[in-house]
């Protein structure tokens, strides 16, 4: 026993080089955001000089005001918030519902349909732009926010994610017990299955939120009016056809990044816990 205790203490002790590696990784991850802020507080000449400037300047609020004057940036942030929130919530609920159906409900063609869902993950997103735009045009949704929300309410990856998680975490005996008590399929899902897989659905919703917030290609194609721009399209509108004002562009980019950083600070611990829970249970 005298030799086991020191050995366990040695294994439980964190080495100094572990902290060094974690600190280096943290600096590497945060440096792009810091550099973005530096450029957002200076002009293009200062941003491109050699050696580069490493101390923030004093022009951030002036450039931020210029961003607001150039494009309706606050409205763009609100549009992005609405679209990203709707897509995040929609994916969390609808993908969980579809994953539950593929995992626990028996119906003709279940395996074939799930295989088709998986095959759609192999199709590049760019190939769906033209038919998707044609559908939006027929519906009269071009230059509307629902053209961004509706196509993103479900995803093949989200359905696969939730199907695997539900298969691993919800037993058939639990569902049978609920059905014996008189619950129908919807009640089993909403009152039993969904509360159990809520952490995984929460993580999926966050992934959907971040993806929708950072999306550029589809909003750039379908949106025409400045008052309906999302944050990424508003940043593109800050650039003209001939040159790029780096300070102006980075000021808009920094203001569009701050909400994501704040979101991660608020829910980062819960997101990591949801990912680890799915990893251990799977």
Specify the residue positions occupied by each region the protein language model found:
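Short, Lys/Arg-rich, polar N-terminal cytosolic tail immediately upstream
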Residues: 1-11
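A structural signal for multi-pass alpha-helical bundles of membrane permease subunits
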Residues: 14-282
